[in-house]
């Protein structure tokens, strides 16, 4: 949809681009619901435990005999849930935008950007390895930049999209360094293998990550902390929250998409994806997640009390709710998908997406 509308939209689909994009997303939503239903009620559970399934995996870049970058799809409880959240909220935004953006000169371009954003988020939530998630992470950043700055003739919108892009890029540098540290010690980019290696004290990867240290902190803790910084930037956690209120300069449906279902919960999703490593191998990093979440929730709530613009109140409300999700992850003892804090965080992510998008 993004490619079709982005390349040919203004020439061939000026009046029908919204209907085409919405129809395509309706199909995507139906497929996401079908996949989630099948996973949760048919084939996902073995002996009472939900499995991490990898239905698709192929080698993308082969550097040498043992060094390659794979691309794949992972299906587990959080990715199945996020498939439904992203497609459903995006579908609602597409439908609402049919009337809201009617008559806009760049109507096809708007839907092309929405399509790119949705594609990027779907790719992010089903990524089977940590480098693949980084690629889609950056695509989410680019598409949010395009959407926030959609009204490019408004100086405030231009300033807001640049601010969001630059602040999240700073955080993403930390994310990339964290990826390099974790993959160097685990010897893999694949999530399942990386988690197994870095949560098993007898493996060579765990021993090297725990032994190597910088200013008294292990390489494993540094790697996880840097990955969390990337997540904190995307999820507007203190002190990287400064871009979020200004992000309301985009069209109102875009604000619903960014502040509800997609971009701001990407950081929570990232911490949840690596949660076993945080909980088992580096409680200190998990404690940092909890503190940052709690501070962000409190500060955002206090700032929201002083705002007079309803859209900025919603922005700080979102920051506060994301803080609660991070806090729940930070205080959760490890129990797999049965950990109470983990479960509460994912449940709140789902419910917040629905009520905030309204």
Map each language-model feature to its residues.
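Hydrophobic transmembrane alpha-helices and their helix-loop junctions in integral membrane proteins
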Residues: 92-133, 142-358
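Transmembrane helix-loop-helix hairpins at membrane boundaries of multipass inner-membrane proteins
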Residues: 8-84, 88-112, 185-214, 273-275, ...
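N-terminal low-complexity, Ser/Thr- and acidic-residue-enriched intrinsically disordered segments
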Residues: 1-6
């Amino acid at each position: 949809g993004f490619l079709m509308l982005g390349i040919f939209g203004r020439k061939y689909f000026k009046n029908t681009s919204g209907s085409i994009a919405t129809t395509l997303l309706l199909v995507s939503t139906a497929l996401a619901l079908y996949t989630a239903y099948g996973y949760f009620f048919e084939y996902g559970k073995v002996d009472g435990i939900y499995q991490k399934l990898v239905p698709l995996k192929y080698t993308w870049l082969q550097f040498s005999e043992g060094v390659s970058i794979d691309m794949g799809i992972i299906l587990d409880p959080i990715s199945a849930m996020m498939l439904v959240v992203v497609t459903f909220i995006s579908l609602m935004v597409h439908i609402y935008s049919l009337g809201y953006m009617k008559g806009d000169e760049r109507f096809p371009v708007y839907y092309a950007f929405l399509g790119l954003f949705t594609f990027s988020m779907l790719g992010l939530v089903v990524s089977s390895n940590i480098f693949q998630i980084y690629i889609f992470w950056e695509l989410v950043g680019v598409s949010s930049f395009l959407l926030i700055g959609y009204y490019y003739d408004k100086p405030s919108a231009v300033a807001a999209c640049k601010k969001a892009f630059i602040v999240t890029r700073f955080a993403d540098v930390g994310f990339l360094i964290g990826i390099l540290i974790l993959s160097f010690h685990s010897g893999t980019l694949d999530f399942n293998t990386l988690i197994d290696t870095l949560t098993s004290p007898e493996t060579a990867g765990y021993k090297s990550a725990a032994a190597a240290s910088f200013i008294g902190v292990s390489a494993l803790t540094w790697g996880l902390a840097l990955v969390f910084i990337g997540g904190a930037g995307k999820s507007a956690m203190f002190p990287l929250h400064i871009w979020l209120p200004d992000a309301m300069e985009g069209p109102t449906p875009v604000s619903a998409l960014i502040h509800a279902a997609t971009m701001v919960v990407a950081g929570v999703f990232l911490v949840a994806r690596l949660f076993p490593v945080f909980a088992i191998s580096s409680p200190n990093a998990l404690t940092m997640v909890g503190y940052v979440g709690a501070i962000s929730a409190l500060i955002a709530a206090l700032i929201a009390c002083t705002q007079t613009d309803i859209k900025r109140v919603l922005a700080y409300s979102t920051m506060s709710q994301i803080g609660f999700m991070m806090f729940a992850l930070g205080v959760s003892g490890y129990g797999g998908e049965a950990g109470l804090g983990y479960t509460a965080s994912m449940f709140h992510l789902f419910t917040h997406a629905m009520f905030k998008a309204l």
